[in-house]
Swiss-Prot record:
Signal peptide: none
Cross-referenced Pfam families: Ribosomal_S20p (PF01649)
Cellular compartments per GO CC: cytosol; small ribosomal subunit
Gene: rpsT
InterPro entries associated with the record: Ribosomal_bS20 (IPR002583), Ribosomal_bS20_sf (IPR036510)
Protein name, entry field: Small ribosomal subunit protein bS20
BP-aspect Gene Ontology terms: translation
NCBIfam families named among the record's database cross-references: S20
Recorded coiled-coil stretches: none
Amino acid sequence: MPNIKSAAKRVRQNKVRRLRNKSVRTRFRNVTKQLLKAIEINEEPEKVNELLRLSYSVLDKAAKKGVIHKRQASRRKSRLTAKVKAYLEARSAGSAQS
């Protein structure tokens, strides 16, 4: 327990910030998992693209709030985009051969 008034206040502030950051982090992790799951189960391309747009939005908001670094957000978006692009190309190649 802190002995100094300002240290006690910092503890309270850190608790609030930790909970806020945790909710933002949970949100972008869940959206990312939804996107990867949609790719895994061969979801419709429209649904996958919608989830990708949502992922972009959530990651950008997390970076804006300082929960993750902007380069980390950019890197995650890039990797998700590459996976979606590969999925869509494989899906279109599969339907073209049928």
